């Protein structure tokens, strides 16, 4: 969608110049504050992209890496990790797309909460599938995790999203 495409550039709209002011708790140069629904939604879309990519990386690695004479993806524990990653991605995708359609700040808060969980937990699970390889420069998994952590604290934290959602029950 348009929200995901705009966030994929990772540019100023999602937190470039205005992101510094918002991260410090104030408004950025364009008056964009930490709870700006557009910035929250674009960050959620960026997190959704990370979640999807780490799920793809985990599945691909699970199919390629062999242990005990068969791919590690043949082991049920690895299959469950990968399946859980895909479920979180699809749940977050629905929330991000819905928030993009409605433009509602409460929907954006819910989308950010779900996308943050999908990105951070997905990157952790991907790292687990990769094992020690995930922390080497040969794999980008550790970069996805670090960036997901940073974006989870940008524009709207989980606590702020939960407060926004609770206030509108």
What does each model-identified segment do?
Residues 40-169:
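Alpha-helical interface subdomain recognition
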Residues 1-56, 60:
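FAD-binding core of flavoproteins
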């Amino acid at each position: 969608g348009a929200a995901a495409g705009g966030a994929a550039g990772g540019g100023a709209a999602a937190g470039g110049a205005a992101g510094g002011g918002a991260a410090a708790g104030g408004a950025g140069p364009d008056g964009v504050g930490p709870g700006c629904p557009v910035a929250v939604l674009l960050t959620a879309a960026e997190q959704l992209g990370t979640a999807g990519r780490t799920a793809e990386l985990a599945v691909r690695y699970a199919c390629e890496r062999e242990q005990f004479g068969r791919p590690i993806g043949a082991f049920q524990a690895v299959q469950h990790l990968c399946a859980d990653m895909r479920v979180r991605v699809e749940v977050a995708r629905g929330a991000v797309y819905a928030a993009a359609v409605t433009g509602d700040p409460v929907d954006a808060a819910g989308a950010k909460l779900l996308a943050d969980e999908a990105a951070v937990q997905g990157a952790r699970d991907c790292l687990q599938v990769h094992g020690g390889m995930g922390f080497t420069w040969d794999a980008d998994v550790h970069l996805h995790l670090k960036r997901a952590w940073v974006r989870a604290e940008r524009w709207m934290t989980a606590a702020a999203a939960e407060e926004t959602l609770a206030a509108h029950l």
